[in-house]
């Protein structure tokens, strides 16, 4: 029989009785009418409808005889004969196609005749199997299914495409064929098509996989192929694939998620919902398994938040009521979920994770494995790192009564004294893993101004300072780092206690700072940060550090950091630099106490180094402490300068005003005009000397800094050039030469902070002592207004200074000398 335009060469001829007179085709459902003639049912019914539509009585198409009725009778015998005839022909067609596919084609591209023959055979197989479901079993038994599967490896795209189409027909509604196709590497071959560049191959492959995934054993094999689920997930979420391909991929994934192993793979590849569905709706054992696997995943932050929102309450419930295995699986999941800020806050605020975590696990008096406490400590550290307000999160379900007859007691929180005491106790009496995480918890709580005071009070009341300091020398690096971070956070609030207790641990700190592991480490940054935050006025600690060689070791390290020769390539370079600058600033605070410190500052070249550090853009703390150190150093210049014989009086005097620079007074060669002796930046710390590396210019540049603290420190350093004990008039000249007068005046006018206003008013008053400047400034109403404002609203000292400045501007009249002397 000719099937859909495909010729069959050896077809058994059809009898005339098999052919419908109307369609001229072999009948499938023959029926007989009143005249005894036989037609295809659909064809004769159509003829009757046309007769009625044309207003004619129904007639026989062959005899044209009018019919009394249009009843038709099935011709059962004829239909049976036709069916047998058709089956014989289809079997012959199938035999020829099978023979062609199984033994006649090697699957290689290049022979067009063989390729065309194979394509015709594939078409015959497809058509026959679509007409007869029984043929699908015959195809399998004769090896055609396997032969078609092998054609998927053909070099001909046409053959590959047709093979994918035919395979889908062969396995549709036939589990035996699906089982057969699932054997060997055919599934792997089909999956490879999902990454093919050709769109049609991808669509046909995913359609075939969708059909195969309806068979449970084959579905399991699909999931077992490496990369299959990833490719399907990618196709299912693709914006470039066709809607059909996306839908088939999604449907295939839904079939695949019947197996736990596939669900885990999907979660690995970002498709979390099947796992969450099992977790939320599964049996208890399934929930535990899903929670356990959830803890093994490396989730993106968005996924962590989604899991926390959907499954957080359930996990907290499992933590409260579950047995030990369930608690462990839940804690693993919570450890992963809590490691982002958004998800941690969801767990705290919506799921209520804190009370069971702390009360039922971490501080539990039951016989829980230490592994669970370690997990709980890690989760707690993650939660604290989220920055949530732990003052408002109670650890108890209900507030306790205070025992006074109805009053309600203060809620227990993570910051309650007894809770902090319990943490400190665990830190000292458990292994390094738990201790490290709890140190991290306390370090996180003390990093917030809102909560640090509670922890400081608890540390003091527990007497745990010595214990915490001992962890600096722990064998485990992580414990050392976390303890250093905690102690550094405590230093601003209990610096004296820490300085007294450090004692022998100072050498350990210095070893940590000086260690060279090929880059800057977190431990180095934390150790030097702690030293830098201890009170700089503690002379005993300064002496200890000096005797231990701390300053001599850190000075060259600071120089290397400035030059960039220490390249950590990480986030710890900046905190290390800031910490070292703070430590080196300490020695400048003690220059008046011991000549050794002065000699060291000279040898180490601290003044030139701090001048260089003023140019460290982006490091406000470094610039701040460098300017502060230069102030301390500059104050020593008048004591260190070597005074020569008195120079000849200058021929005349001029001063740099707001817009021009006067000529400086003549001084002997090599003599500092500000300090009146032989000065240098390195030896006498003089900012005004030519070897100062533009110290004054760099300090002036800092007056425009956005950080008011840096501005104040730079102004304080510059003020040493116009203070008592130096030639202030010459200091004004130096400031003028560096274009520093206008910025000082602008600071006073802007009045950003009270401290800045006080310093600026003092400096302006000193500048206005130079008559030439006072004369010019008198015309600037903004300066006078700023001084009047300081005079009206400043503190007593600032008001006195502003009054003197206004007198320089003749804004306040000069009274009698006697009265003036009393006023001064």
UniProtKB/Swiss-Prot annotation:
GO BP field: brassinosteroid mediated signaling pathway; protein ubiquitination
A cellular-component GO term for this protein: cytosol
Keyword field: Brassinosteroid signaling pathway, Cytoplasm, Nucleus, Phosphoprotein, Repeat, Transferase, Ubl conjugation, Ubl conjugation pathway
PTM (free text): Auto-ubiquitinated. Phosphorylated by GSK2. Phosphorylation of PUB24 increases its cellular stability.
Effect of residue 20 to Y: Loss of E3 ubiquitin-protein ligase activity
The keyword Nucleus appears for this protein: yes
Keyword Transcription regulation: no
SMART domains the record matches: ARM, Ubox
Function per UniProt: E3 ubiquitin-protein ligase that functions as a negative regulator of brassinosteroid (BR) signaling. Targets BZR1, a positive regulator of BR signaling pathway, and promotes its degradation via the ubiquitin-26S proteasome pathway.
SUBUNIT field: Interacts with BZR1, BZR2, BZR3 and GSK2.
Protein name per UniProt: U-box domain-containing protein 24
Organism: Oryza sativa subsp. japonica (Rice)
């Amino acid at each position: 029989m000719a099937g859909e335009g495909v010729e069959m060469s050896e077809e058994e001829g059809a009898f005339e009785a098999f052919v419908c007179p109307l369609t001229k085709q072999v009948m499938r459902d023959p029926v007989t009418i009143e005249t005894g003639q036989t037609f295809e049912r659909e064809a004769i019914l159509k003829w009757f409808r046309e007769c009625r539509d044309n207003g004619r009585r129904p007639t026989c198409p062959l005899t044209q005889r009018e019919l009394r009725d249009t009843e038709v009778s099935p011709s059962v015998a004829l239909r049976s004969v036709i069916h047998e005839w058709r089956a014989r022909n289809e079997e012959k067609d199938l035999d020829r196609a099978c023979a062609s596919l199984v033994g006649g084609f090697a699957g290689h591209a290049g022979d067009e005749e063989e390729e065309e023959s194979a394509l015709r055979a594939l078409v015959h197989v497809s058509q026959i199997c679509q007409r007869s479901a029984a043929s699908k079993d015959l195809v399998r038994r004769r090896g055609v299914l396997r032969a078609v599967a092998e054609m998927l490896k053909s070099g001909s795209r046409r053959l590959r495409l047709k093979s994918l189409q035919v395979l889908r027909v062969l396995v549709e509604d036939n589990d035996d064929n699906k089982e057969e196709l699932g054997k060997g590497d055919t599934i792997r071959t089909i999956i490879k098509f999902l990454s093919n560049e050709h769109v049609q191959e991808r669509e046909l492959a995913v359609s075939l996989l969708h059909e195969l995934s309806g068979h449970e054993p084959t579905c399991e094999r699909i999931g077992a192929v490496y990369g299959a689920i990833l490719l399907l997930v990618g196709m299912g979420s693709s914006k470039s694939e066709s809607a059909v391909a996306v839908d088939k991929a999604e449907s295939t994934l839904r079939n695949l998620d019947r197996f736990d192993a596939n669900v885990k793979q999907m979660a690995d590849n970002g498709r979390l919902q099947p796992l969450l569905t099992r977790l939320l709706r599964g049996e208890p054992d399934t929930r535990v398994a899903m929670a356990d696997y959830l803890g093994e995943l490396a989730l993106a932050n968005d996924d962590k938040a989604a899991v926390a929102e959907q499954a957080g309450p359930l996990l907290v419930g499992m933590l409260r009521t579950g047995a030990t295995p369930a608690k462990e699986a839940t804690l693993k999941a919570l450890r992963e979920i809590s490691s982002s800020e958004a998800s941690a806050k969801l767990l705290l605020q919506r799921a209520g994770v804190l009370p069971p975590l702390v009360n039922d696990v971490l501080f539990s008096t039951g016989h829980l494995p230490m592994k669970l406490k370690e997990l709980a400590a890690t989760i707690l550290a993650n939660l604290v790192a989220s920055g949530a307000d732990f003052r408002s999160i109670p650890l108890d379900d209900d507030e306790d009564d205070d025992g006074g007859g109805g009053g309600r007691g203060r809620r227990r929180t993570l910051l309650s004294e007894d809770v902090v005491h319990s943490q400190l106790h665990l830190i000292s009496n458990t292994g390094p893993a738990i201790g490290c995480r709890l140190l991290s918890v306390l370090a996180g709580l003390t990093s917030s101004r809102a909560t640090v005071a509670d922890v400081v009070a608890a540390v003091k009341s527990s007497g745990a300072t010595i214990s915490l300091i001992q962890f600096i020398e722990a064998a485990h690096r992580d414990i050392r780092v976390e303890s250093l971070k905690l102690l550094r956070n405590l230093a601003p609030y209990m610096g004296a206690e820490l300085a007294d207790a450090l004692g022998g641990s100072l050498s350990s700190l210095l070893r940590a700072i000086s260690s060279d592991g090929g880059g800057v480490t977190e431990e180095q940054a934390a150790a030097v940060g702690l030293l830098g935050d201890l009170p700089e006025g503690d002379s005993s600690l300064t002496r200890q550090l000096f005797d231990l060689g701390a300053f001599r070791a850190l000075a060259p390290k600071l120089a290397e950091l400035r030059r960039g020769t220490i390249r950590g390539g990480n986030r710890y370079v900046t905190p290390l630099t800031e910490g070292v600058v703070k430590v080196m600033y300490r020695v400048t605070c003690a220059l008046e106490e011991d000549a050794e410190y002065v000699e060291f500052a000279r040898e180490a070249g601290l003044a030139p180094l701090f001048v260089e550090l003023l140019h460290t853009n982006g490091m406000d703390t470094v610039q701040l402490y460098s300017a502060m150190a230069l102030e301390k150093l500059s104050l020593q210049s008048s004591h260190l300068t070597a005074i020569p014989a008195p120079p000849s009086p200058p021929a005349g005097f001029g001063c740099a005003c707001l817009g021009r620079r006067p000529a400086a007074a003549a001084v002997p060669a090599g003599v500092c005009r500000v300090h009146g002796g032989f000065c240098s930046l390195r030896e006498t710390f003089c900012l005004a000397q030519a070897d100062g590396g533009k110290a004054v210019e760099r300090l002036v540049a800092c007056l425009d800094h956005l950080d008011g603290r840096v501005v104040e420190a730079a102004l304080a350093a510059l003020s040493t050039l116009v203070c008592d004990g130096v030639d202030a008039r010459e200091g004004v000249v130096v400031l003028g030469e560096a274009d520093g007068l206008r910025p000082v005046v602008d600071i006073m006018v802007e009045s950003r902070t009270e401290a800045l206003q006080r310093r600026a008013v003092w400096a302006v008053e000193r500048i206005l002592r130079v008559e030439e400047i006072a004369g010019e400034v008198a015309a600037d109403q903004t300066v006078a207004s700023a001084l009047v404002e300081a005079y009206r609203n400043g503190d007593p000292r600032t008001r006195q200074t502003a009054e003197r400045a206004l007198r320089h501007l003749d804004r306040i009249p000069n009274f009698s000398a006697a009265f003036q002397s009393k006023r001064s």
